[in-house]
């Protein structure tokens, strides 16, 4: 049986090869063999093991099976594996800053990472967000990135101002970020409506 560090290393090597358009057959076989030693009935691992040693295996089929194996093992890439995801979250924060300025608030917020967690989080001028942060894969999709960054920014800002931000101008209640019709929006729950797209908060609304 592999140690936890060796297991993580194999998962990462396999993932990085898939990311770069190939399949590390050695990592694929070793990882699947370890899973089969623990659970001989693991069909995903059995398929990868068979394809990894077959010289005539269809590369696309092997890649798909390897991705399925990693998914079944709940492997989650980090920002080290996908630095572009952190860049995407940084870009999303720039969009959210426009809403702070529209409400007359400082845009002195930043994205940071910390030891012991794979996630990123938002730090405002007087407080950090209090949740678990933003998971790396949120940066994979622009809309998801914007929603997650908006939520974390909202948490940090509300702990900085000790009040709801932003607020629906019609219902005078706090709104929350969500995806709606393929866009990241500020949504008023009680009113059941979109107040504004994230990054486009009207200046007259505070």
Where are these regions (language model features)?
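Long, charged N-terminal interaction/targeting segments
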Residues: 2-144
């Amino acid at each position: 049986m592999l140690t936890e560090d060796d297991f993580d290393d194999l998962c990462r090597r396999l993932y990085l090869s898939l990311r770069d358009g190939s399949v590390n057959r050695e990592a694929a076989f070793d990882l699947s063999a370890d899973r089969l030693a623990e659970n001989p009935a693991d069909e995903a691992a059995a398929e990868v093991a068979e394809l990894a040693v077959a010289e005539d295996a269809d590369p696309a089929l092997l890649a798909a099976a390897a991705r399925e194996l990693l998914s079944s093992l709940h492997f989650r890439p980090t920002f080290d594996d996908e630095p572009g995801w952190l860049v995407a979250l940084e870009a999303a924060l720039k969009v959210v800053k426009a809403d702070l300025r529209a409400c007359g608030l400082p845009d002195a917020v930043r994205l940071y990472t910390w030891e012991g967690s794979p996630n990123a989080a938002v730090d405002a001028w007087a407080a950090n967000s209090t949740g678990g942060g933003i998971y790396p894969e949120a940066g994979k999709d622009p809309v998801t990135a914007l929603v997650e960054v908006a939520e974390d920014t909202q948490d940090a800002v509300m702990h900085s101002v000790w009040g709801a931000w932003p607020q629906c101008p019609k219902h005078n209640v706090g709104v929350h970020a969500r995806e709606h019709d393929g866009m990241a929006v500020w949504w008023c729950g009680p009113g059941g409506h979109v107040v504004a797209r994230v990054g486009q908060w009207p200046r007259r609304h505070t």
